[in-house]
């Protein structure tokens, strides 16, 4: 299984990273401490059977609040852009929303992206999440950290696999029932330690406030 929960390689957006970067450049513009090291298996609480509580999202941008990430990382650049995701609607279907940001100057040099996919049932979502959790250490710089109190289960890490041309690539993956959401913060310029430390709880808040919107 070489696919992420949102039905596409996690670093891709539309036609590919380079095209996105071209679009970005053309625009103007918790405490974050480790709670535990991620293991190879998932120890999920909550229901493990049934179709789940979520239907596939179709328009994600109107539901995502990028305010916490804007305050933590950098000002936004331009309007958010959305698209549908999922290579097989009979298995998984979802949506994504990208918000460009600028750490310096007037040109966009980074992006915050939220992906959310509803899997066909809870067992499938659990299986995909467990696979992603077990694979994360191969992609991570430093520890893969499990997050408590966020959906049914969640983890975060700093990605280095296929991260180029980004200098920093922060990722948070959350499963709640049959829904999987991922927040990515990717910057062409290195983020400061302060920005990274502030980004983790902001990413968590983004998902925490989004999940109830996806249930409605």
Name these PLM-found stretches:
Residues 3-17:
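Bacterial N-terminal signal peptides that target proteins for export
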Residues 16-24:
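Bacterial N-terminal signal peptides
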């Amino acid at each position: 299984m070489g696919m992420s929960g949102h039905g596409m390689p996690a670093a891709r957006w539309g036609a590919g990273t380079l095209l996105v970067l071209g679009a970005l450049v053309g625009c103007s513009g918790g405490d974050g401490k480790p709670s535990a090291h991620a293991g190879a298996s998932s120890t999920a609480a909550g229901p493990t059977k049934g179709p789940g509580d979520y239907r596939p999202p179709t328009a994600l941008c109107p539901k995502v609040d990028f305010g916490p990430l804007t305050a933590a990382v950098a000002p936004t650049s331009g309007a958010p852009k959305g698209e549908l995701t999922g290579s097989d609607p009979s298995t998984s279907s979802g949506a994504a929303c990208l918000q460009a940001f600028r750490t310096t100057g007037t040109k966009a040099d980074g992006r915050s992206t939220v992906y959310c996919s509803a899997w066909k049932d809870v067992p499938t979502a659990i299986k995909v999440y467990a696979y992603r959790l077990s694979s994360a250490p191969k992609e991570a710089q430093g520890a893969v950290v499990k997050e408590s109190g966020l959906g049914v289960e969640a983890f975060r890490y700093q990605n280095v696999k296929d991260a180029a041309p980004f200098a920093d690539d922060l990722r948070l993956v959350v499963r709640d029932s049959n829904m999987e959401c991922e927040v990515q913060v990717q910057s062409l310029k290195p983020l400061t330690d302060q920005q990274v430390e502030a980004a983790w709880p902001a990413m968590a808040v983004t998902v925490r406030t989004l999940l109830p919107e996806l249930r409605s």
